[in-house]
């Protein structure tokens, strides 16, 4: 068995969902840009301070709480009945529930990287930094470990996930 789930699982757990109409309206009123405009690779590259203000306050401030359905997936995996989970969730809900074989097609807020030197940073470093987080080694702005609007999902990862199905 293979489990496929999208961002809806996160909404059910209370994770931030900027695609929710009411939340999207509130974000646009707050920042003057829609969530799709702000959670965009071009916005990140040209307005990094504004991007991180939005990202920290409105994207990663509420990572949700685990629900029984996620722990059920872990039990199925432990019993050898669940081959893998393929998800668009960026909050690593399946991994947080203890599942091992997870394909996070859109990445994870928990894995962040310096685009210059490759050093990895945990979510806490991003969240606790003042302004845009910078690499301690080279000073470059750290890149969130998630696919943003306007980016292509890793084709190799898509191929691996397709092989599982």
Residue map of PLM features:
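Conserved catalytic core of sirtuin-type NAD+-dependent deacylases
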Residues: 1-165
